[in-house]
Every structure is written in structure tokens, then in C-alpha cells.
Amino acid sequence: MGKSVMNTSTEEKIVTALFLCSDKPNEVLAALKPEWNNKCELSIVEKLFIINYSLLIQNVFPWKDELSEGIDHEKFCESFFVQPDLFLRLRPGKEKMVKQKLQQAEIKFTIVSDSCLALPNASKVDDVIELDNEAVIQDYSSQQTGDFMDSAIASLENNKPSVWDCCAASGGKSIMMYDINPNIDLTVSDVRESILINLKKRFTKAGIKNYKGILADLKGPLFPFSTSNFQLVIADVPCTGSGTWGRTPEQLYFFDQSNIETYSVLQKKIVSNAIPQLQPSGVFIYITCSVFKKENEEKVDFIKENFHLELIQMEVLKGYNKKADSMFVAVFKKNL
């Protein structure tokens, strides 16, 4: 609930949170607040009226002025009382097999698209399917960034484009790019060696054998390769992660607003070192899982002003009405 009910007892906060987050009656609420228990199926707005608190939904996420354009602040706040889904991206050729395995294990799922399934968040799929080989656990909005990558790869008119995932982290987007075009000449980098070790294991499961893994700190200017080396650069940069806080709601209470500027400075350093590696006519894709404009639209302005790339497309991927994360993606082209 963020800081929306600061002047109440801990017990009252717990009971209120349980009521707001429950979608069906339960024994705990029946014991503590029976008059609320049979009203769990009501909407968040109706529940807020019932509790008769000075709880302002807008104060769940009090940084409204920092939000990217187009985000409905009230709907975004309401989404924190709904458990996000677990999303699977089905790998090419494995779609039917995965669905059959889930059905046999009596695991409920909803078909979002041909390659995307939504499951209850607590679903145990590890023992049912071969993760990374048959399907990848990947949020819906993160999967949507694949559409931008697909268009970018197609625009390069090269069956084996050189691609650099410069902030590879868990490698989900690299696997997705490989599924879009298995012929890509893939380079992944991260500042942490442990990440590259884990990537190697994950790529082995995913069947990705031909790639380069490089330890690189993009906060500094030193690189293990020359400039203008890649046709496509993906920068899924470190950020506040504010678009994912439905999965880590404690951030609503503990987040320090000064961290927005801290990450903004870091993002400028990363893109300033990554963009020079882009070939003429190449494509640069900037991605965050943030809802803050300083990390999103203001970074687009920074890139346009300092590197003179052409903005092809940018979009806030609103996941708050889909039980998913919210993200931001911008696509640029380096003209000749």
C-alpha cells in the first residue's frame, strides 16, 4: 500500500491489505474482519469505499509527476493490489508440446498469443517443462519488445546481422532475438562475470552455441572491440525497475526518489559508450522496465540531441492492465 495508510496501526494495515489484495473469501479475513470477507470479489474502487479510510489510491505510488506520458496514474496504483501473472514465451516449434504438458499436469493457463501463456504467479512449471529449451519465463511486456527487435532485424536486410546485447543480464532478450533469427552474429556483455557464467549455462539449454560473451563495464570508455562494430545494439539498461514493482511492492515504501537521478546518470554513460559501436544504417534499441520519464522520454531526447540518431518509434508498454510489468522501448536508426 506504499505510504497511503501511514497513520494506522500495523494490525489495521495488515487487515486492510489482505482485504484489498484478496479476490475471494478466506479464513484469516473471516476471523479478523468478517464483515469484509464476503466482499472480496468487489473491485478495488468498491473496496476502498467500504474500508472508509483516508487511504488515497493516488498515494500508493506518490511519484505521479515523474511518470512517463500516457500512464494512467490511478489505474497504475490500483494494479498494485492485483497479483501479477507468470508469463511463458513458447519457443518456436515447442508451442503445442508445452501446452500439452501443462494440461497433463493440470496447470491452468490462459493463451495470450500464439507464443505467450499467462499462468497464476505461483504455478510450478519447473518440473513440468524444460525451461529455456521449450519455453522461457518472460514477462508479457518484455515479450512485446520482441516485435521491435523483429522489425529492426528485418530492416537490416542481412540474414546474419551482427547484434550486441550490451546489458545482457539474464539473457532473455538474447534468446528471443535468436528465436527471431537463429543466424544472428550475437555478442553479449555484462559488467558482472557471474552473469556471463550463468548466461553460458542458460544458452546451452536454449541451444545457442555460437556467440561471444564479453566482460564490459559500459560506465567507462574502454572496450575490447573497435567502434562501428554492430548492425543492431540492444540496450536494456539498468533502471529503477519501477514498472516491475507489482512483483516487489516493498519498493513502494522504501524507494528513495533520488535514485531516479542516479539511474539517469548511469543510463547516459551506458548509451554514450554503446552507440558509437553502431554501424552506419544500424539500429539502436533502448529499453527500460521503468515508468519514470527521466529514464524514458528524457533519455530519448538525450540520445537525439547528442548522437543525432533518428527516432523511428517509441512506446510505453503498459502492463498494469494485463497483470504484467510496464516497460519502455525506443528504436533509433543511425543514418549514413
Residue ranges and their predicted role:
Residues M1-L336:
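S-adenosylmethionine
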